[in-house]
């Protein structure tokens, strides 16, 4: 009997459901959508809806919705999207503390039922939640991946392509640091099919693109009026899973646990990584000028301040 690859998605909201649909079409593995008891219908309904699209799209992926965490058993990858969004009147500290508890409990359950899996974290604030999952699960650092960098870089590349009226496929650029206002798009490493972006766009316009990238999530929230982005975040997670299952050795920005890289230790935030079958197989340190390095340290400090507000055992 052939062992089919298994992907469990904890949280069947917009992002989790969209990711399940993408993965099903790509036939990367069988899928389990996990939700809370009170949201059983959402998990099972979305799973069935995706399953029923199989004859049209032409895929044979198994998609199962459940409220039983034990159904993640023997998963190869577990994606953690569970958590609450920031509500009106809620402080950032309250959001962090609430989601930290959710992620901590979930990571312990993953360690129990899927001890050999790779965990991909999307719950916000994602840098600190990735650190929480790392500490709570006890997994080796290469099997804990936070994802924001692919999303942030995709936004950055999109805005550059729009400004230049060129194909987004020809825009290459990386975004490092924390997911938020302190993220660092590497302008000096941004090229359009080999041509440095600084040769094509004014410094003022580049600064505007960088600022728009940093506010990219908030821009979507404002436009939607309710909820947040989910198509692009789900696609970013898909790209990571594809790199793992196909051992592609992709150079992708990921949130990783650092032990001295970029002058940072005991922290998780976005850096260039090689993603393959083992998860994060290598962290790549790129050359930076002094200004970029100082901005990255500022970003690390911002992430550390949130992390230090929590108590880790």
Curated annotation (Swiss-Prot):
Its EC number is 1.1.1.37. Substrate binds at residues 86, 92, 124, 155. Pfam families: Ldh_1_C (PF02866), Ldh_1_N (PF00056). One of its GO terms (molecular function) is L-malate dehydrogenase (NAD+) activity. Coiled coil: none annotated. Gene3D superfamilies: Lactate dehydrogenase/glycoside hydrolase, family 4, C-terminal, NAD(P)-binding Rossmann-like Domain. CDD domains: LDH-like_MDH (cd01339). GO terms for biological process: lactate metabolic process; tricarboxylic acid cycle. Keywords: NAD, Oxidoreductase, Tricarboxylic acid cycle. It is an enzyme of class 1 (oxidoreductase). InterPro entries: L-lactate/malate_DH (IPR001557), Lactate/malate_DH_C (IPR022383), Lactate/malate_DH_N (IPR001236), Lactate_DH/Glyco_Ohase_4_C (IPR015955), Malate_DH_type3 (IPR011275), NAD(P)-bd_dom_sf (IPR036291). It catalyses: (S)-malate + NAD(+) = oxaloacetate + NADH + H(+). Belongs to the LDH/MDH superfamily. MDH type 3 family. This is Malate dehydrogenase. It comes from Staphylococcus epidermidis (strain ATCC 35984 / DSM 28319 / BCRC 17069 / CCUG 31568 / BM 3577 / RP62A). The lineage of its organism: Bacteria, Bacillati, Bacillota, Bacilli, Bacillales. The gene is mdh.
């Amino acid at each position: 009997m052939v062992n089919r690859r298994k992907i469990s998605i904890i949280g069947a909201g917009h992002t989790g459901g969209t990711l399940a649909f993408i993965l099903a079409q790509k036939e990367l593995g069988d899928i389990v959508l996990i939700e809370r008891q009170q949201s059983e219908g959402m998990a099972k309904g979305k799973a069935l809806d995706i399953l029923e699209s199989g004859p049209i799209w032409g895929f044979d992926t198994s998609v199962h919705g459940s409220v039983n965490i034990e159904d993640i058993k023997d998963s190869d990858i577990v994606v953690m999207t569970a958590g609450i969004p920031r509500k009106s009147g809620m402080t950032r500290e309250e959001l962090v503390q609430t989601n930290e508890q959710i992620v901590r409990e979930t990571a312990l359950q993953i360690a129990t039922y899927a001890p050999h899996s790779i965990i991909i974290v999307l719950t916000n604030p994602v840098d600190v939640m990735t650190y929480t999952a790392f500490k709570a699960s006890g997994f080796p650092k290469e099997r804990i991946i936070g994802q924001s960098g692919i999303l942030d870089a995709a936004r950055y590349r999109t805005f550059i392509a729009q400004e230049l009226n060129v194909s987004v496929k020809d825009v290459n650029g990386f975004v490092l640091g924390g997911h938020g206002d302190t993220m660092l798009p590497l302008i000096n490493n941004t090229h359009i099919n080999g041509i440095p972006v600084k040769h094509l766009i004014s410094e003022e316009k580049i600064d505007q693109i960088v600022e728009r990238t940093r506010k990219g999530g908030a821009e979507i929230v404002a436009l939607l009026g309710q909820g947040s982005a989910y198509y692009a975040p789900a696609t970013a997670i898909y790209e990571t899973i594809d790199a793992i299952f196909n051992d592609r050795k992709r150079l992708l920005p990921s949130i990783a646990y650092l032990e001295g890289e970029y002058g940072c230790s005991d922290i998780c935030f976005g850096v260039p990584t090689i993603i393959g079958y083992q998860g994060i197989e290598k962290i790549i340190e790129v050359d930076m000028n002094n200004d970029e390095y100082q901005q990255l340290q500022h970003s690390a400090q911002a992430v550390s301040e949130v992390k230090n507000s929590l108590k880790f055992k």
